[in-house]
Amino acid sequence: MRDALEKKIAESEAAFPKILENLPDRLGYRAEDGTDYYGRVIMAGGEVLVDKVRQRVLYPILEGLQKKYDGRVHIIIQTTGDLVTDEILDELLARNVWLVSVAGMDDYHVGHEGEKRLPVMDRLHALFHSRGMVQMNEYEPVRLSAQTAHTWYNMFGATEDAWIGKLWPRGRAWLNGLTTATLDDNFCNAWSGGLSFLNHGEAGSEVSIEPDGKVYPCCLKTAAPLGDLTQEKLIDMLDALRAEPALQAINSGDPAAMGENYGWSREHFIERASAKMPNGIVCNNLCLGCDAFFGDVLGPVLEKSARVRLDRSA
């Protein structure tokens, strides 16, 4: 485990300067009323506050974002909260962090089951308030207004009434048979899904960037990447892929349509959107159809497209 962590950290250290270089010169979006807002960078996945990750990867990235955008970007740290101390919070705020988002406030995280999470939440509330931070859920209209001087925090978890309550068919939720997602749960057509990922410069456009620079249209991550941010600029990548019908289907939140130009009917996509979890229970979800289509068809198409783009720029 220690060797795997060191390998991932070294990979991130090598990749992040190029990733920062290939991000857009301006990160922002325009709302429906025509108002321009800062864009957001969410640092999440695993636990970004682990000492080695925080010191060797997270802090240099935060400092690089500050240098590139001069504060004109909203930086969000997502953490389970266990490692948020007075010292670490001060270090984050000093590096222009705008929101600390505490995930894992649910029964799936050890030590947070039921009322066990209440003391954890009380400690975090007190810590955040001591730094003048405002709980985002309490002042949602302020969050959407012009840039404010506030720093924010929120807490959430995979509870039944939450948007992630069904659990994505990924990771431990898949390995442990915890996902209850069905074909009615379209993760693509939602926040953190592929919806509007191609529409850069507009509200809701979002991509997922791995530590090695691989880019995906959603947080769940498709079975193959769109491209590599250590090798090309993000906007160039998205613009080059804009005409791909399968990606347009993801962009519109309609993944079952992604194979229609490749001989995959909606009916066939639904047939392939089924797999048996390690515990023997069959899961039926659109993400599984997406995995199958990427594996059989779209993965090689995207790989070829990336090679062509890189050859042209060589």
Regions flagged by a language model, labelled:
Residues 1-159:
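Conserved glycine-rich "GG(E/T)P / GGGxP" loop and the immediately following alpha-helix
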